[in-house]
Design a protein with these regions (language model features):
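ANL superfamily adenylate-forming
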Residues: 44-55, 135, 141-189
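AMP-binding/adenylate-forming catalytic core of the ANL superfamily
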Residues: 119, 136, 272-275, 282, ...
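Conserved AMP-binding A3 loop
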Residues: 60-64, 193-220, 251
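Conserved AMP-binding/adenylate-forming core of the ANL superfamily
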Residues: 14-15, 35-95, 99-103, 120-125, ...
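Conserved pre-ATP/AMP-binding loop-to-beta segment of ANL
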Residues: 34, 166, 170, 176-197, ...
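Conserved AMP-binding/adenylate-forming
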Residues: 322-336, 340-451, 455-458, 465-468
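Conserved AMP-binding/adenylation subdomain of ANL enzymes
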Residues: 216-233, 238-281, 295
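Conserved C-terminal "lid"/linker of ANL adenylate-forming enzymes
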Residues: 495-500, 509-511, 531-578
Length: 578
C-alpha cells in the first residue's frame, strides 16, 4: 500500500507528520544508495597545498549509514533528557553529521534552530535569548564564541561535534555509539521542526518557524519544478537544498568550499568536484555561478556532464546567463526567486530569459528596468501593493482594492500558500511588520521586494522596499542602475543607493569598487570613468548625483550577492564621502 504524503496525516498528531519519515522511507526502499559524499579535511588540505593536485577524493555515506546514525544519536539525546517540545541550537558547518544531528532532533519532536556558520557571537546570543534552547550542538569554536553571552552560557546541555580540548555535556561521536535506537514521535502538522533566520539585511534577523507540514510542502513545491532522476548526483551550496535532497532520495555531494568565507580558488574546487564526481545537477548562488563562468571561460573549460543548474539567492543578469550557456552547453539553467520565508516563489529558465525581448537588443548600452524572475510557482497566491512603510491591516476586500496597484505597475510583492512560512518564532512584532492576516484568515507574507507583473505572467524585480530611493518626489530603484554599473569594464562590485539631501530628500550615489584598487588614486582615470558612467546612466534615464570609487562594497554573508546598503551608507558617511 502506498504511504500517505509526509505532513498530511489525518488527526491532530501522527508519526507520518514527522519529516523524519522522508528519510525512513528512502532507507527502507534503497538502503545501499549513496546518500552523501564529501571531501574530508585531510583530502582537502592535500588538494589545497599540492600544486599538482587535479582530483578530490570523496568519502560516502549510504542512506542506511545516515539512518542508523540518526536513530542512535536520537536515543543518545533522550538519555541526556532531550525531549519533544525542547529547542536545540545547531551551529555546525555543512558536513554529513550536521544532517544526522538535525534529523535526530526532528524525529524526537525537538525544535531545531539552524544558524549559518558565518553567524557572529552577538547573533548567536540573540537567537539563544529569543528561543531559549535546552541543548546546543556545536564544534568547540562555537562554544568559545558563547563566552560573555549570558543566553548561550545558560544552555544546560552542550554537545560537542569534532575535536575538543574541554569537557562538555557530551560528545556527538559518543552518541553515535548509543546501543539503543529511537523511534520517531507523533507530532501535529504545525509542530515546529526547524527555525531558520533571515540575514537581517532589513533589520534584526527573524526566525522563520518551519513546521513539519511546511517542510513537507516546501519539498513538494521544489520537487515540482526541480524534479530529480534516481541517477542524479547533486551538489547544493544551500543547506536547505541538502535537506530537500534527503527528502527526495537524491545523492548529495557536499561542496568542498567554505561558503561563509569565499576564496579565490572556489570556482576551481567546484569545477574539480563537478568533473571528478560526474555531477549532473548543481544548486548555487549567483556569485558562485559568476565565478564558475569566469573560471571556465578563462581556462577554456566546459562542463558537458551537467544537465541542470539552479541559481538562487539574488538576481541573475542576462549577461551571466549568456556566459553559462557557453560553458555548459547541455545544461538547463533555472533561476529561482525566493526567500527564507517562501522558497520557491518564481522560477525562469535561462532559455526563457534570453528569448525575452530586451532593450539591449536595440542598443547594448541600454538595460531593462528590472530583472525577469519568471512565473509564479504552482499553488502560490500573490498580490502587488503600493509602497507602505510600516504594518498593514486588512479587514475587507475594499481595503485590499485600495492597497493593490494596477496590473503592470511597481509594488511590493505579497505571497501566500502552503509553502509560505506563516509565522516567526516567538516574535509577534516581526509578524506585525512582515505579515498580513486578512479578513479571510489568509496569512500573506510581505517579501519586501518591489516588482511588477507583466501581461505574459512574468515577474520583474526592481529593488527592495528598504532600498528604494525617494528623490525629488519620485521613486528610484537600484537593480537597473547596478546592472549598468556592473557592465563597466573597470567594475568589480557596484551599488546604487540614496543618502539624505536637504533639497532632493535623497540624492543618488553610484559606488564602484574597481577591479584594481590602485586605480582609485589615479584622479585623471577616475574622472574619465565618472564621465563615462554619467553618460551611460543618463542614456538609461537614471539620475546620478554623485560617483564614488571605493575599495570595497559590503555584501551579504549568506549569498555574497546582495549589497549591504545600510553598512555601505554608514561607511561612506564615516569617511566623509557623502
Amino acid at each position: 500500500m502506498a504511504l500517505p504524503k509526509i505532513g498530511y496525516d489525518i488527526g491532530n498528531e501522527g508519526v507520518r507528520n514527522n519529516c523524519f519519515c522522508f528519510l525512513q522511507d528512502h532507507f527502507e526502499k534503497h538502503p545501499d544508495r549513496a546518500c552523501m559524499k564529501w571531501v574530508n579535511t585531510k583530502s582537502k588540505l592535500w588538494f589545497d597545498y599540492n600544486p599538482f593536485a587535479r582530483t578530490l577524493t570523496h568519502d560516502t555515506f549510504t542512506y542506511k549509514n545516515i539512518h542508523d546514525m540518526v536513530v542512535h544519536v536520537a536515543a543518545g539525546y533522550k538519555k541526556l533528557g532531550v525531549q519533544k517540545g525542547d529547542c536545540a541550537l545547531v551551529y555546525v558547518p555543512m558536513i554529513p553529521w550536521l544532517y544526522a544531528g538535525m534529523f535526530a532532533f526532528q524525529m524526537l519532536g525537538v525544535r531545531c534552530i539552524f544558524l549559518d556558520s558565518f553567524a557572529r557571537a552577538d547573533q548567536l546570543g540573540y537567537v539563544a535569548d529569543l528561543c531559549k534552547p535546552k541543548v546546543w550542538l556545536s564544534g568547540e569554536r562555537g562554544f568559545s564564541m558563547g563566552k560573555g553571552q549570558p543566553a548561550l552560557e545558560a544552555i544546560p546541555v552542550k554537545i560537542n561535534m569534532g575535536p575538543c580540548t574541554k569537557t562538555w555535556t557530551a560528545r556527538f561521536e559518543d552518541l553515535l555509539e548509543t546501543p539503543e535506537a529511537a523511534e520517531p514521535v507523533a507530532v501535529a502538522q504545525e509542530h515546529t521542526a526547524l527555525i531558520t533566520f533571515t540575514t537581517g539585511s532589513s533589520g534584526t534577523p527573524k526566525g522563520a518557524d518551519r513546521s513539519h507540514r511546511f517542510l513537507a510542502a516546501q519539498h513538494y513545491a521544489i520537487d515540482a519544478f526541480l524534479p530529480y532522476k534516481e541517477s542524479d548526483l547533486d551538489l547544493p551550496v544551500f543547506p536547505i537544498f541538502s535537506l530537500n535532497n534527503l527528502a527526495a532520495g537524491v545523492t548529495t555531494i557536499l561542496p568542498a568550499i567554505n561558503v561563509a568565507e569565499p576564496a579565490d580558488n572556489d570556482p576551481y574546487v567546484l569545477y574539480t568536484q563537478i568533473t571528478g564526481e560526474n555531477i549532473t545537477t548543481l544548486t548555487l548562488n549567483p556569485s558562485l555561478l559568476n565565478g564558475l563562468n569566469k573560471y571556465c571561460l578563462e581556462k577554456g573549460k566546459t562542463l558537458p556532464g551537467l544537465r541542470r543548474v539552479a541559481a538562487g539567492g539574488a538576481a541573475v543578469s542576462r549577461d551571466v546567463v549568456e556566459e553559462f550557456a557557453k560553458i555548459a552547453p547541455n545544461a538547463e539553467l533555472v533561476v529561482m526567486y525566493g526567500s527564507t520565508e517562501a522558497e520557491p516563489m518564481t522560477h525562469i529558465t535561462g532559455k526563457e530569459m534570453l528569448a525575452q525581448r530586451s532593450v539591449t537588443e536595440t542598443d547594448p548600452e541600454l538595460v531593462d528596468a528590472g530583472v525577469n524572475v519568471g512565473h509564479f510557482a504552482h499553488g502560490l497566491q500573490y498580490k502587488f501593493i503600493r509602497i507602505v512603510r510600516g504594518p498593514i491591516e486588512v479587514a475587507s476586500d475594499k481595503q485590499w482594492a485600495e492597497l493593490e496597484v494596477p496590473q503592470g505597475s511597481v509594488g511590493e510583492l505579497l505571497v501566500a500558500g502552503e509553502h509560505v512560512c506563516r509565522t516567526y518564532y516567538n516574535n509577534p512584532e516581526a509578524f506585525k511588520t512582515s505579515k498580513i492576516r486578512d479578513h479571510n484568515d489568509i496569512v500573506w507574507h510581505r517579501t519586501g521586494d518591489l516588482g511588477r507583473h507583466d501581461e505574459q505572467g512574468n515577474v520583474w524585480i526592481v529593488g527592495r522596499i528598504h532600498n528604494v530611493i525617494e528623490r525629488d518626489g519620485k521613486y528610484l530603484f537600484p537593480v537597473q542602475a547596478e546592472v549598468v554599473l556592473k557592465r563597466q569594464p573597470c567594475t568589480r562590485l557596484a551599488a546604487y543607493l540614496g543618502v539624505p539631501d536637504p533639497k532632493l530628500g535623497e540624492k543618488t550615489v553610484c559606488v564602484i569598487a574597481p577591479k584594481d584598487n590602485a586605480d582609485i588614486k589615479n584622479q585623471k582615470l577616475c574622472a574619465e570613468r565618472e564621465t563615462e558612467i554619467r553618460r551611460v546612466m543618463d542614456k538609461n534615464k537614471i539620475p546620478v548625483d554623485q560617483v564614488i570609487f571605493h575599495p570595497d562594497i559590503p555584501m551579504d554573508l549568506r549569498h555574497r550577492s546582495k549589497v549591504e546598503y545600510g553598512i555601505l551608507r554608514d561607511e561612506l558617511k564615516k569617511s566623509g564621502l557623502v
